Structures are given as structure tokens and as C-alpha cells.
């Protein structure tokens, strides 16, 4: 099941990278919003765009946790992928 999920997540990541859309990656305790700059074998890297930082927010409270210039997350930790509308 893990390999199949990772393959689906990776397919979505490549689609967002291809169109250059801002993406939201949901992980168990937080989510991150930004633009994909690199999809590696096990990690995906997001960067800020248009002068805004990568947004890292708590899933429980929605509170901002940090605003780094870029962040890398492990693909196997990603629960879901979405656009940034309404996130």
C-alpha cells in the first residue's frame, strides 16, 4: 500500500510542478504551502514565491509555525496533496 500511495503522491507532485502551481502538502501534524522546486527520490522541496515564504501551519489550529525560504519533506510522510485554494 505504501508504494502505491507514494506513486500517486509523486504523480500529483509532478503535475503541480509541471504547471507551476502553488501546492499544499498535508503531513500528519502540519501542512506546507509553496512552489515545488525539486522532486527527488525520497524528498520534495518547496520554495517561496512572489515574495512570500513557504507557509508551514498546524493542522490542529491552523496557526503559522514558521515561514522558511524553502523546506524539504519526505514523500512517504505526505498524506495528501492539494492546490492552495481554501487552505
Q: What are these language model-derived features?
A:
Residues 1-87:
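Conserved RNA-binding domains used in RNP assembly and mRNA/RNA metabolism
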